[in-house]
Amino acid sequence: MRLPSVGAGVPRRGSAAVRAFGRALLALMRWRVEGDVPDLKKFVIAVAPHTSNWDFVVGMAVMFALDLKLTFIGKHTLFRGPFAPILRWMGGVPVDRSSSHGLVGEAVRGFESVDQRVLAIAPEGTRRSVERFRSGFVHIARGARVPVLLASLDYAARCVRFGPLIEPGSDVEAEVRRIEAFFSTVRGKNARG
């Protein structure tokens, strides 16, 4: 299985066993990965469409196979019980979505506090059907002065595609519309409607 190149500056997990596990999982699920991960120490990955819990499994398989050390934001209720330490080890950060106040600032401070960080976010903010992507991920990227890498989960082709790297401009709504257009033809696991 050919995997994309990953730049030397990108945060890595550094485990051959985890890398082998991720590659085996991708092969077992018959998924492939296209595109390249830029050689940057800090960026946001916008992953869409997010329509199923299987998206997490596919995303983790890619993260492990490429030896990426990612941070991701998850619903705080997922971080309870026996899975909490595992999710944190994987890079999970719990958030209370009912209180979005301060989330952008907290994420920006997270970027400022470290030398390397890749933050993966589902722009929809949920698995439910939404009319528009939320704009928080663009605000985070602008506040942290980092680009956004687009990554699609194409279930029709069983392919994760790393797409363009976007430097967000000052018109956040225009950026969100441009990013939505990139994902508009990608079919998630569950149809949106």
Model-predicted segments: where are they?
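Helix-enriched interaction subdomains in cytosolic or periplasmic regions
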Residues: 1-19
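Soluble catalytic domains of membrane acyltransferases
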Residues: 6-11, 27-185, 190-193
